[in-house]
Amino acid sequence: MNPLQTGPWQTSAPSFWLLKFSFIWLVSQNCCTASAVWTAYMNISFHVGNRMLSELGETGVFGRSSILKRVAGVVVPPEGKIQNACDPNTSFILPRNKEPWIALIERGGCAFTQKIKVASENGARGVIIYNFPGTGNQVFPMSHQAFEDIVVVMIGNVKGMEILHLIRKGVHVTVMVEVGRKHVIWLNHYFVSFMIVTTATLAYFTFYHIRRLWVARIEDRRWKRLTRELKKAFGQLQVRILKEGDEEVSPNADSCVICFEAYKPNEIVRILTCKHFFHKNCIDPWILAHGTCPMCKCDILKALGIQMDIEDGSDSLQVLMSNELPGTFSAMEEELNNELPPARTSSKVTHVQEHPTSVNVGSQPPEAEETGHPSFGQHDL
């Protein structure tokens, strides 16, 4: 009994694939939880001489836990050279007229929550965090703790440094932050990575299995063609059923050089193209394994028009033809063979057995013996 055919995994294949698909679906849902990102419109205003300059643009992104509302105020950076506001004792130069103000803080040094907390404790209405140096105007939605009535926005490093330089020059800079557009992000980078790996794996295995099926189909066609050619070739070789009184079964007759057994009545012999004959059950596997006559080394398959490839191993050929070359004749074949005159051992066979060191490969059997076999035309189908 084959456990691969009766095991529980074979009978519950649909359930197994359904469970596998459900697991992948749950992982995908966990990886691609939809998240909304809100952009921020920022109207930056400052005085240059007697002129008021303003710059309006969608240059910021609200934090994930930030409240979404309009806020305006004076932009105030932390005091000192360190602008990350990670120190709980960080102070800000507050406006003299106590107007609302918004903290301008550099990213890095600590978590976003810590920066927002420090600015909130100092009375800021909002927090603008600008990105690392070298990141240009890149922004992303920050993850932080939610604070009541505090607007949190990230802007690019370039824009943040422009505002900071103006403030350090003594320019009074104000900003108005308004809620911009909503963007829904369904795919985060974890899910994208997962999908890339999964797609590449599926593509590889699909290509691998298609190639295996293609190669197997070609091999199957080649083996079928070879089977037909071998059956046709073996059918061209003469066969004979020995009888009582034949010279081959006499006590002084030669034996089969493959099994070293003497020929007996009712045994089937196959006669090769070189006129040597052997037990059919002995010579058929020998030809499949070697392709030549065991006595004169004549290439039997080549003489029959069969071109064997190197990869066609002898074991594979024997397994392939084991069910294709029957070991016994049908009743009709036996009846026809019984009507033939007894086969005679060729002089070549006798010569090899008596004088093994002086084998004459090119010799031909006497004409009298050839005429004694006028009906060597029976074929093994």
From Swiss-Prot:
Top enzyme class: transferase
Post-translational modification note: Auto-ubiquitinated.
ZnF (RING-type) intervals: 256-297
Pathway stated in the Swiss-Prot or TrEMBL entry: Protein modification; protein ubiquitination
Keywords carried by this UniProt record: Endoplasmic reticulum, Membrane, Metal-binding, Transferase, Transmembrane, Transmembrane helix, Ubl conjugation, Ubl conjugation pathway, Zinc, Zinc-finger
Keyword Ubl conjugation: yes
Pfam families according to UniProt: PA, zf-RING_2
Membrane topology: Single-pass membrane protein
Record's compositionally biased regions (Polar residues): 344-363
InterPro entries cross-referenced by the UniProt entry: PA_dom_sf (IPR046450), PA_domain (IPR003137), Znf_RING (IPR001841), Znf_RING/FYVE/PHD (IPR013083)
Domain PA: 65-167
EC number of the protein: 2.3.2.27
Chief location bin: endoplasmic reticulum
Transmembrane segments: 186-208
Locations listed in the record: Endoplasmic reticulum membrane
Any one GO molecular-function label of the UniProt entry: ubiquitin protein ligase activity
Any single GO CC term annotated in Swiss-Prot or TrEMBL for this entry: Golgi apparatus
BP term (GO), one: protein autoubiquitination
Subunit structure: Interacts with E3 ligase UBE2J1.
Known role: Has E3 ubiquitin-protein ligase activity. Plays a role in male fecundity through the interaction with the E2 ubituitin-protein ligase UBE2J1.
Protein name: E3 ubiquitin-protein ligase RNF133
